Amino acid sequence: MSGPELCVGAVAVRDGSILLIRRGTPPGEGLWSVPGGRVQRRETLVEAVRRELREETGLDCEVGDAVGWTELIGRRRHYVVVDFWVTVDSNAKPVAGTDASDAAWVAFQDLGRWDLVDGLLQFLTDHQVISGP
């Protein structure tokens, strides 16, 4: 295993819903998550959030404060993920792009019925993005 890889996530909420993408590539292929991915060389965290959101949903955003961070440690990879609050145009509709096979606004109360990446629901609850399952 190499050293940790730095990643970002974009947490967009509106009207009791959160923006999710269905991952089109590993890790978590086929599962739903917040938009995000690896930070590229010479890229700031804010630049990475904007790029990943645009690539995966076609949406532009304003990046706010960090929601929190988590570590995902597997047999071959170690990811450190910092998630940020983002604001998107309330009338814009997400369209799945690179690394995403689908994109949707999901009501908080429905999250428990979606196939989410491991730990996402707990992260969103722990960081008070949602009040619980």
Predicted regions and their residues:
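Conserved beta-strand segments that form the floor/walls of ligand-binding pockets within enzyme
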Residues: 7, 33, 83-85
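Conserved Nudix-box catalytic region and its N-terminal flanking loop in Nudix hydrolases
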Residues: 17-55, 59
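A structural signal for short, well-ordered beta-strand segments
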Residues: 10, 66, 84-86
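NUDIX/MutT-family hydrolases
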Residues: 85, 95-127
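Conserved hydrophobic "DFG−1" position in protein kinase catalytic cores
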Residues: 12, 20, 86-88, 105
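A short coil-to-beta-strand element that immediately follows conserved catalytic motifs
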Residues: 59-68
